[in-house]
């Protein structure tokens, strides 16, 4: 946005009463917000405000005279309170630079330009927007109705002294409407003032004329070549986003490019029409034939069969590969197809259509595809027990152990039921166990049939017992079903539910399933084993003296003398400074002192040293004693908790060394 250079851009600004009053208010606000220490002259601002009196304007109204009187009173209050401002207050006028050159010319109103804005935000259009501050600036009354709404100043802020005698401080909850607006040069201040005087909402929508001032500036519409770096075609952008490309019917498979997939439309088939699988679906060896054969006899059409016949017919023909077909793929001259012409289809009204077994076997014999069972185990052909003799079995005794039929039918004679059981025994003469079981099944089936027949005959003689017979039949069926449900299964092979005996390895550990323990951590306890001493000691070798010789610069270490020797060119060996002195004799003796007063062991070692006669005596001054005493106190405080303290501690032993030294003197 363009920056506002001055307030007098409008040539009629001096004659406009509202604009003049607005500028006067802004100058008064700036004067009220400044401090003395920043170099701003209050007298200069007062004289400037007096020069801005608009009483000479020919179009002035009576409210303008009131406003001039209010401005004069405000200036008087400012001049009387300027001494109250403390010197350590940050000056508000530091953010503005006042141009004083306009006083010499005809320019009535000076230009106010911001010098710096530390706490302001600058957007991308270089518009200065004031940030929110903790203290609120004094509002400006724009009309006679808003005179009571004056600026509020905190008591703790020295920049805004409280004017207790002013009649403007009656309403304390008033806040200026200018805080709701951002400082924008394109905003029409005259329209905002007009809205405020007419008690209109300043945030209401502007008219078409007023919206022209809020339009985006022309500088934002300038083509700066920002989109030149992007290869974007705006004409084709919508097409690429919203228009979906139509895929061709013949697409290329990414994994197998040589295979072309075709999309075809398949209408919904009627529910009654059923398609049965072809023979090549049942026998995969027939899949090597040409799938695009145009022979109409080999295709199945649902139109040739009616709805009733489609559910009971297989395809009319079967295809089979010839025995002499070549195993080489693609050799169509050698391969041939065989179509049996004598296939018979047995069809009846009550049964499904069945193919001829001979034709099916012929097709199966010509097929190359053979399936082998997985994990086939041959246990025998079933003739292993034929050589063994049959065991003697008492069938009559076993029949007694069998549970007889306990179902009773109401209205039926017991003699028939008993006769049926007798017939069971008369027919039980099997030759083997397997035949005997089959005969028992036949007997039970015949007994059931006789029971049903007797019930039917009884219906003709006894009509009122129809309901009872139905109930008995239902009970018989339920009993049979319950027996089948509660029948226990034969025992199967007992499987080991435990984990298989395979060694488990976790890190460096291995589980031994036989010993049921973990192994592999034996190395952890090897350090605790006693070292095995060698069977014979090592040979003691002679250490040569040449191995210990070391040379550092001009010095050579002699391992025999255990000292360093000068190996300079001169060859002169330096004299030993301690050659005239004898070695010191060790005269130290130790004694152990036991404290008998304390019950615990408090041993102390006191060393008694036999010093030679002291030739010199040093006098210790009082300052040195004070220094040692203070250091001793500090040291005791530091190590006070390091040792155990006893109640009956005898500290007399601490004076032994002192007494010994004094006795020798």
Swiss-Prot record:
Chain positions covered by the region annotation Disordered: 96-120, 196-220, 288-336, 404-506
GO biological process: cell division; negative regulation of exit from mitosis; negative regulation of mitotic cytokinesis; negative regulation of septation initiation signaling
Function as written in the Swiss-Prot or TrEMBL entry: Has an essential role in ensuring cytokinesis and septation occur only once during mitosis. It does so by interacting with the ras1 signaling pathways, thereby suppressing them.
Organism classification: Eukaryota, Fungi, Dikarya, Ascomycota, Taphrinomycotina
Family to which the UniProt record says this protein belongs: To yeast BFA1.
Keyword Ubl conjugation part of the UniProt annotation: no
Protein's name according to its UniProt entry: Protein byr4
Subunit annotation: Interacts with hyperphosphorylated cdc11.
Compositional bias per record (Acidic residues), positions renumbered to this chain: 96-106
Origin: domain of life: Eukaryota
Signal peptide: none
Gene Ontology molecular function terms on file: GTPase activator activity; signaling adaptor activity
Compositional bias segments (type: Polar residues): 205-220, 288-304, 319-336, 407-432
């Amino acid at each position: 946005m363009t920056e506002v250079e001055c307030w007098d851009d409008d040539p009629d600004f001096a004659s406009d009463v509202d604009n003049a009053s607005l500028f006067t208010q802004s100058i008064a606000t700036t004067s009220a917000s400044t401090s003395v220490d920043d170099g701003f002259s209050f007298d200069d601002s007062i004289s400037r405000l007096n020069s801005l009196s608009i009483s000479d304007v020919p179009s002035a109204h009576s409210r303008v005279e009131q406003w001039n009187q209010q401005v004069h009173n405000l200036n008087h209050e400012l001049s009387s309170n300027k001494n109250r401002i403390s010197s350590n207050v940050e000056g508000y006028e530091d953010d503005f630079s006042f141009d004083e050159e306009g006083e010499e010319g005809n320019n009535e109103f000076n230009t106010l330009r911001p010098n710096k804005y530390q706490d302001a935000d600058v957007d991308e259009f270089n518009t200065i927007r004031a940030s929110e501050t903790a203290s609120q600036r004094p509002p400006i009354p724009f009309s006679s109705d808003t005179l009571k709404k004056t600026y509020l100043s905190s008591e703790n802020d020295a920049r805004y002294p409280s004017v207790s005698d002013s009649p403007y401080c009656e309403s304390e909850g008033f806040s200026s409407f200018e805080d709701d607006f951002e400082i924008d040069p394109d905003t029409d201040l005259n329209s905002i003032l007009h809205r405020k005087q007419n008690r209109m909402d300043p945030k209401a929508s502007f008219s078409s004329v007023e919206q022209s001032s809020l339009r985006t500036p022309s500088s934002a519409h300038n083509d700066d070549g920002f989109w030149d770096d992007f290869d974007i075609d705006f004409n084709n952008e919508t097409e690429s986003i919203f228009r979906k490309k139509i895929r061709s019917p013949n697409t290329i498979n990414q994994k197998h490019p040589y295979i072309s997939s075709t999309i075809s439309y398949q209408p919904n088939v009627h529910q009654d029409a059923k398609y049965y699988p072809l023979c090549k679906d049942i026998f995969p060896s027939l899949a090597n034939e040409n799938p695009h054969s145009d022979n109409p006899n080999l295709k199945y059409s649902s139109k040739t069969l009616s709805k009733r016949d489609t559910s009971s017919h297989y395809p009319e023909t079967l295809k089979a590969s010839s025995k002499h077909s070549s195993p080489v793929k693609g050799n169509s001259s050698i391969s041939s197809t065989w179509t049996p012409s004598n296939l018979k289809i047995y069809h009846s009204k009550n049964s499904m259509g069945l193919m001829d077994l001979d034709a099916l076997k012929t097709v199966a014999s010509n097929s190359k595809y053979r399936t082998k069972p997985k994990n086939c185990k041959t246990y025998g052909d079933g003739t292993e027990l034929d050589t063994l003799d049959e065991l003697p079995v008492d069938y009559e005794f076993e029949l007694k152990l069998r549970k007889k039929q306990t179902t009773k039918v109401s209205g039926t004679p017991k003699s028939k039921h008993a006769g049926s059981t007798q017939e069971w025994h008369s027919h039980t003469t099997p030759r083997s166990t397997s035949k005997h079981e089959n005969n028992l099944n036949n007997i039970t089936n015949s007994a059931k049939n006789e029971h049903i027949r007797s019930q039917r005959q009884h219906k003709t003689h006894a009509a009122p017992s129809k309901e009872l017979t139905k109930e008995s039949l239902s009970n018989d069926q339920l009993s049979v079903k319950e027996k089948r449900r509660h029948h226990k299964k034969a025992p199967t092979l007992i499987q080991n539910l435990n984990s298989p005996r395979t060694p488990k390895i976790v890190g460096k550990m291995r589980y031994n399933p036989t010993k049921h323990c973990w192994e592999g951590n034996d190395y952890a306890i090897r350090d605790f084993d006693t070292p095995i001493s060698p069977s014979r000691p090592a040979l003691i070798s002679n250490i040569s003296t040449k191995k210990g010789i070391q040379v550092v610069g001009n010095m050579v270490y002699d391992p025999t003398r255990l000292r360093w020797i000068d190996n300079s060119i001169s060859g002169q060996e330096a004299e030993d400074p301690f050659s005239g002195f004898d070695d010191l004799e060790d005269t130290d003796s130790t004694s152990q002192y036991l404290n008998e007063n304390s019950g615990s062991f408090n041993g102390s070692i006191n060393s008694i040293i036999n010093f030679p006669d002291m030739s010199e005596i040093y006098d210790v001054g009082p300052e040195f004693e004070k220094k040692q005493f203070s250091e001793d106190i500090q040291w005791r405080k530091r190590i006070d908790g390091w040792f155990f303290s006893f109640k009956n501690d005898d500290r007399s032993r601490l004076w032994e060394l002192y007494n010994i030294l004094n006795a020798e003197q």
